[in-house]
Amino acid sequence: MNIAKRLTIYEDKGFSRERAEINVLMEAAALAIFRDFPEAFVLFGGATLVLYHDSLRHSADLDLLWRGSEAPSREDVAACLKRDLSPLAEILGMESLAFEFQNLADREARIYVNATGRQLFRVDLTRLGSAIEGEVESHPVDGEGHGSAVIKCVTKDPLLLQKAEAFLLRRSVKARDAYDVHLLRERRAKLTSNLRAHLEDSIRMNEINSESIATRIGKIDRKLCFLELKPILPADVYALLEDSDFEPLRESLKELYGEWL
């Protein structure tokens, strides 16, 4: 991996140096995991948007959905990360990396990657959902001295489903979900009939009505976006949204949930 080149690419997009370094570490983490466990995982979530869909929103979560009956242990995954990330962190001038574990629920685990008491990012291991079986694309990566791998990622459409459900089901509305929905729709992501049926099921099972959806969309306002998006977006990107009073985010949500409003 050409570290200087990768850092420059992220900085040119508007990421700070610190966040560019985290993105490079997450790239290396994905390469290491898919090289050592080529059939075990699918990459999902916000990091996928940053790495493969040009999202400018900082995401410090590397979400891995595992396939099959048994995933590699969290210890095996952490050992893989330690071997590949430690030399890279040293080049970036970071102190020794530390890895902490957290079990969240049955068949799930979380690995925190820390340096000098600061959390850099985390790796979530979660069971693959049936809604996205077959919705996977491959990205060959040449890691130069670290070998090569084919990184398998969920496609844009199920990522849109994930964000659509997250926006409605979280206890409190998150502006980052609205931003991700807007980004994915700009990237021409859509809900296929199968994915739309899954969203319909989620809405019905959770007894979400049109008024509730409209209320949540209305909460994407200046105050919430200032608190949640300003810290994680490049200044120029945030300024454009602010100048439009964040209407593009609300409009994307209205279009997404149109038939339920």
What residue ranges belong to the model's regions?
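Structured mid-to-C-terminal alpha-helical surface segments
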Residues: 1-42, 52-62, 67-261
